[in-house]
Amino acid sequence: MAIKFLEVIKPFCAVLPEIQKPERKIQFREKVLWTAITLFIFLVCCQIPLFGIMSSDSADPFYWMRVILASNRGTLMELGISPIVTSGLIMQLLAGAKIIEVGDTPKDRALFNGAQKLFGMIITIGQAIVYVMTGMYGDPSEMGAGICLLIIIQLFVAGLIVLLLDELLQKGYGLGSGISLFIATNICETIVWKAFSPTTVNTGRGTEFEGAIIALFHLLATRTDKVRALREAFYRQNLPNLMNLIATVFVFAVVIYFQGFRVDLPIKSARYRGQYNTYPIKLFYTSNIPIILQSALVSNLYVISQMLSTRFSGNFLVNLLGTWSDTSSGGPARAYPVGGLCYYLSPPESFGSVLDDPVHAVIYIVFMLGSCAFFSKTWIEVSGSSAKDVAKQLKEQQMVMRGHRETSMVHELNRYIPTAAAFGGLCIGGLSVMADFLGAIGSGTGILLAVTIIYQYFEIFVKEQSEVGSMGALLF
């Protein structure tokens, strides 16, 4: 039944655009160049406005998710990486529930990846239609069918570009993956902007700068009471403050510290005597995958809730899913959940909000920890990183665990890998919650993603440098 499903969609996968694997080893400097080109294309798409939209100034329903999903309001990157991540989430859940089975052969894995890409394109079209028909760019009846279709086509083509850019890096032409690169860029851009933004905001206390550091100097220069000015710079509401910035740096340091936690399993060569090595099992065994999938789940729930709330406002079941309110305080107009399931699955705005509504905080903590642990545990089964897959890789390299035969390696690895995956996912969720409660810039999830992705690129750079021998030879 499961394999039949993949076989059914095989003809459709064959007609999808695909990046061919490189026929030769790509040098590091070429990888850096392709990564830079990929990032440049993404950033250009983030600045090109959608043609035909009447307005994008209304309250943004996905403001809270845009940093994580690398999307930009009213541009070609409106959908960001959401379709790719959502298709991965769906395929993972189907594989985890054994509705479809992914074999160990490269053919089955390639078919699974093709199915994921196909679903990504279908989801892109679906999300584009929902965005247009719910009036995000103006009343569809006023815009007309032709303009609506044009906007949908633009979003689809942009989504296809993101899919291909991600595949370009994944196939080995660049460094890391497109998803990781786009997320990290978007989050780092947000942090720098919130710290140094020269944009002025008219508050009840007078005109203030949005950037926390610029606001500090501005307040000290314009206020006669310097102590009060410092207090405002550190604790002002609805705008980035210095405590948010300090919390962000603190979370960066904590996550980097946890990146070093691992268990080294001793292994030896089955062919050569005296050749010993270690196989590291990191605390963050599945890296940032759990938090990416959790973000995709929540963002799609937001989309559904917003769509239903627009069409069926006041309906009891719709309100049970989520009720929304618009605000423009401290930045662009945005919609945020004030009730229903969406409210309880969204992070509290500050530590003060935790004290005001502890039930909200408890439900959010349980959801974050549980979902991250679940996604981490199920991801290892479909990504080729389970105990059985690792044992197979070691066997192919003619390596065995010291003190164990080949037949008992899977059993021994099963003692560590599923535990590391589940506990690592739990820690990822816990760190994200901590960052949210501390008020870190870019949300706890965003900070966590940025740090893990930057650390991955650091590891890639170190690995390439060790192979080449020097930094000069690496780049020039």
UniProtKB/Swiss-Prot annotation:
It is found in: Endoplasmic reticulum membrane. GO terms for cellular component: endoplasmic reticulum membrane; Sec61 translocon complex. The chain crosses the membrane at residues 34-53, 77-96, 118-138, 145-165, 173-193, 241-261, 289-309, 355-375, 421-441, 446-462. PANTHER family: SECY/SEC61-ALPHA FAMILY MEMBER. Belongs to the SecY/SEC61-alpha family. The SEC61 channel-forming translocon complex consists of channel-forming core components SEC61A1, SEC61B and SEC61G and different auxiliary components such as SEC62 and SEC63. The SEC61 channel associates with the multi-pass translocon (MPT) complex. This is Protein transport protein Sec61 subunit alpha-like 1.
